[in-house]
Amino acid sequence: MAEGVRRLLGKPGSVSLQPYIKLLKTIEEREEALRKLSDAELTEVATELGNAELPYDRDDLAELCALGREAARRTLGERPFDTQLIGMMALLDGHVAEMATGEGKTLTGALAAVGFALRGQRVHVLSVNDYLARRDAEWMRPLYTLLGVEVGWISQESTTEERRAAYAADITYASVSELGFDVLRDRLATDVSELVVPEPNVAIIDEADSVLVDEARVPLVLAGAAEPAESDAAMAELVRRLRPGIDYKVDDDGRNVHLTDTGINVVEKALGGVDLFSAEDTTLLSRVNLALHAHALLHRDVHYVVRDGKVRLINESRGRIALLQRWPDGLQAAVEAKEHLTPSETGEVLDSITVQSLVLRYPIRCGMTGTAMAVAEQLREFYELEVAVIAPNKPNIRIDEEDRLYATAEEKEEAVVEKVKEVHATGRPILIGTQDVAESERLAKRLRRAGLECVVLNAKNDAEEAAVIAEAGTYGRITVSTQMAGRGTDIRLGGSDMRDRDRVVKTGGLYVIGYGRYPSSRLDDQLRGRAGRQGDPGGSVFYVSVEDDLITTNLPEAKGYRVSSADGEITDPAWKEMVNHAQRIAEGQLLELHRNTWRYNQIIDVQRSVVLEQRRAVLHEDLGSRQLAVDCPETYQRLVEEVGEEEVARAARLVTLYHLDRGWADHNAFLADLREGIHLRFLGRRDPLDEFNRDAVPAFKGFLDEARARAAEMFEKLEVVDGRLDVAAAGVKRPSTTWTYMVQDQPFSTDLENIVGRVKNLMGRD
């Protein structure tokens, strides 16, 4: 009934699984026949299945499922459940399969990858990190080998040749960031032989909600001409002396900070009587604002950690160190100055691509996750993906208790410690999920003071996270973890070897405690899903306080609660619903931010595609030579006579590509500046997006003609040196080094909030 109503309303729901379920009996019959075949004969069956194109008809699909099941049994010692085969078929139909934790998503994805690969599709299995990419590729390798398909994987340490070899395989496992960086590097290639990433066919995305929603806006960046950034230690020291609440104020939602009139006077006096709002030097106000944001809004062990003398950002959706992420250069340098660190390198952005744009390159997209329905609307809106909700192989018997709500953070912490004492006394393993690093360490200290020894898994020791989380089901173990660190690793009752499984089962299984609700219900569900794996017993409960960021940020006016007991607990159902309401507000804000970023990126992606198509023609079709032969006929002919057609073609290619790349880098910088300042026009009651498009479109008009004209101008200046055309002397200068990173987009507020806040300050001055 509910599903039918959703369809009538046009809202995303689960796709019908009936076509897949109807095949299960046929699959089982085929499986019996395949069991009699030798390995070589099984490989031959796989080869024969590949003698056709997608999609699979019902007969071939049943054969493929039976083949995958038998191959997995022989090579991995695992016979896929019916639910895994249903998930496999959903992936082959281009859906996102929602499968609970522990239901075998890795094998499901591998079986689907085989199905695509046998039909001639190049498959990229995208993971959230290098560890999982390598682990899953090696784990599934025997299965792939038996079925006659090759598998490869790449990591941050992979050489160019190793990457090329991995991408040449039928199936390639890679983290989203590494794939994106390879795509960006290919966009600077000056010869076909330098290209690494083949044309995209199929993307199977693991942890699809994390990649496609949480990180969709994250730009992957390729920079060149790196040089040390300027340290602003003096400005950091100045804002360090400012008084909170007097010289500056932080907004109630904690997303913006601004100087008060008193603070403006203090800063201007400290800087020698300058006018912060002088039109002659706009950089001074920017420097002050950056230093103030770094000081007041970005907190060590919450938003970042300092490791090996460097600022390392914490990925908010995963609770892990994000080694490849950084803030935009000015803010990055401000945080480094705040921490008295040497400023890291900065450089010119040559190109960038968001995770969303990276995934949309693939004609066929599908994925797996434990929490897809909660973001079904985004998956449909941004990726044209539908969700297939697949029931667990065994019924879920986990007991999810009602939230426990407290008046203060201190009372919540005390209640959690008491609960841990009570549960730990039974030997039941406990997993506590916290919001950030500082919180995990503070709670761990409190537990230890109470005589409760615990293992802390947070962004500071992420290298061992898989091994640590694998033991969280050990009898008597207490594990404190930031958000979803260790995601992708199963927690087995009794420890990784399951030695004490029966004893842990008798205690009630893993007990999960959420130390505060997350900004997204999906993150809550992911934490809960750690318990009750594959029909195991388990339990979960969330402890929340009115002082939690989720409440104070999204419902700052919430007051008037009544404490129900001496320990500060609030049992009023209306107040518990307020927590859900605050979470819905947070989710709505994130969705609108995603939509807003997508709208701005649409025009940029269209313009980028024009440049990339031109670049492809220059690399593969000698477009540069043909254009310059027309634009500079006399010079072209003279040079051909001097050095030959091949050398002239090489020089023409390098010159043409240089001006395409140079022009795009300049245009990209223009778009970034335009995007940064566009919200000022909101104050004039004009729509910022319309204004952005109104400026971005004409700025790109004539781009290709301009690049072609500049290439012709440079081509005329080419000289022959030792039998070759010296393009460097003519001005072709490629960056000596390039580097890649991910930008932490909008860490504390939108551009509009920041700029309007500054303008309010300006308008408030006499």
UniProtKB/Swiss-Prot annotation:
Transmembrane segments: none annotated. GO terms for cellular component: cell envelope Sec protein transport complex; cytosol; plasma membrane. The keyword Acyltransferase does not apply. It catalyses: ATP + H2O + cellular proteinSide 1 = ADP + phosphate + cellular proteinSide 2. It is found in: Cell membrane; Cytoplasm. One of its GO terms (molecular function) is ATP binding. ATP binds at residues 84, 102-106, 490. It is a peripheral membrane protein. Keywords: ATP-binding, Cell membrane, Cytoplasm, Membrane, Nucleotide-binding, Protein transport, Translocase, Translocation, Transport. Its EC number is 7.4.2.8. PANTHER family: CHLOROPLAST PROTEIN-TRANSPORTING ATPASE, SECA INNER MEMBRANE COMPONENT OF SEC PROTEIN SECRETION SYSTEM. Part of the Sec protein translocase complex. Interacts with the SecYEG preprotein conducting channel. Has a central role in coupling the hydrolysis of ATP to the transfer of proteins into and across the cell membrane, serving as an ATP-driven molecular motor driving the stepwise translocation of polypeptide chains across the membrane. Monomer and homodimer. Part of the essential Sec protein translocation apparatus which comprises SecA, SecYEG and auxiliary proteins SecDF. Other proteins may also be involved. Belongs to the SecA family. This is Protein translocase subunit SecA 2. The gene is secA2.
